[in-house]
From Swiss-Prot:
GO MF entries: peptide antigen binding; signaling receptor binding
Domain Ig-like C1-type stretches: 205-291
Name of protein: Patr class I histocompatibility antigen, B-1 alpha chain
Native source species: Pan troglodytes (Chimpanzee)
Stretch list, region Alpha-1: 21-110
Length: 359
């Protein structure tokens, strides 16, 4: 009955709601073996868009799926019990995957090894699946991945081809596709609705341009965007109306520590020609794109405190990612979160009923 109610509610949302832009739900699972020191450590983090909302750590005193965002705390005890069971089942499956990988690669059990999975879904403004993901890595290298068609696999090497043949025989891609098109999107809609005050907000960026002389002949113009949410933003420099993409230095979007983000884009320009350059900013929170120039009479002062705070959070984030997913090869696609699809998991779970696959 609860499953039926969820499906009905999801169908109603799909018909009546429109979402500002696309949204994503992603899970990352990481298992790290430690010979002589017990079972592998298993860590899970889940994200909706840029917000972490759940975490599981097998090394905790009492391992449970734990909330990491206020809006997920409204889920009842059954939710947390179910997700905890799924995590424990996934941890066991990934331990087996580590043992299988040792055999496939003819490796010794003496060393430490890592098995990781990333899976999830992107949802379009119409509330339907935009793209699904299912990617696996072993010891920091691509192992096998679900293709964009959600019906076939790409194996990275001959060992992964063994897994590919096994999964093709079991028609695992069909099960994965059903989860991504159904359960994954259904739960993403539910989370977006429950956390709409934070997840569906649009904080516009605070913008300015700074000027940094390099020599008597050149200077750097840096276009700043601070305090925006969601993280997706576009910064471009133009010279006399022509894009300067190839000559632009663009940093990755960085967290500021207050659930907003910052980013900058810089170009080196000939001294005296600064006014020929314009910075163009596009963001969901802006009613229309912004166009900025450097104003010589009022050199912008960089808000050092905010930037330092952002860099501090970036360091912490990188440290966490190093434990959870740093060794997973980055793909050009935006990707979802990973984990193994547990055969024993309840179909009411946000993780789905087929998330943990043995290699």
């Amino acid at each position: 009955a609860p499953r039926t109610v969820l499906l009905l509610l999801s169908a109603a949302l799909a018909l009546t709601e429109t979402w500002a832009g696309s949204h994503s739900m992603r899970y990352f699972y990481t298992s790290v073996s430690r010979p002589g020191r017990g079972e592998p450590r298993f860590i899970t983090v889940g994200y909706v868009d840029d917000t972490q909302f759940v975490r599981f750590d097998s090394d905790a005193a009492s391992p449970r799926m734990e909330p990491r965002a206020p809006w997920i705390e409204q889920e009842g005890p059954e939710y947390w019990d179910r997700e905890t069971r799924n995590m424990k089942a996934s941890a066991q499956t990934d331990r087996e995957n580590l043992r299988i990988a040792l055999r496939y690669y003819n490796q010794s059990e003496a060393g430490s090894h890592t098995w990781q999975t990333m899976y999830g879904c992107d949802m379009g403004p119409d509330g339907r699946l935009l793209r699904g993901y299912g990617q696996y890595a072993y010891d920091g290298k691509d192992y096998i991945a679900l293709n964009e068609d959600l019906s076939s696999w790409t194996a990275a090497d001959t060992a992964a081809q063994i897994t590919q043949r096994k999964w093709e025989a079991a028609r695992e891609a069909e099960q994965r596709r059903a989860y991504l098109e159904g359960t994954c999107v259904e739960w993403l809609r539910r989370y977006l609705e429950n956390g709409k005050e934070t997840l569906q907000r649009a904080d516009p960026p605070k913008t300015h341009v700074t000027h940094h002389p390099i020599s008597d002949h050149e200077a750097t113009l840096r276009c700043w965007a601070l305090g925006f949410y969601p993280a997706e933003i576009t910064l471009t420099w133009q010279r006399d109306g022509e894009d300067q993409t190839q000559d632009t230095e663009l940093v990755e979007t960085r967290p500021e520590g207050d659930r907003t983000f910052q980013k900058w884009a810089a170009v080196v320009v000939p001294s005296g020609e600064e006014q020929r350059y314009t910075c163009h900013v596009q963001h969901e929170g802006l009613p229309k794109p912004l166009t900025l120039r450097w104003e010589p009479s009022s050199q912008s002062t960089i808000p050092i405190v905010g930037i330092v705070a952002g860099l501090a959070v970036l360091v912490v984030t990188v440290a966490v990612v190093a434990v959870v997913a740093a060794v997973m090869c980055r793909r050009k696609s935006s990707g979802g979160k990973g984990g193994s699809y547990s055969q024993a998991a309840s179909s009411d779970s946000a993780q789905g009923s087929d998330v943990s696959l043995t290699a």
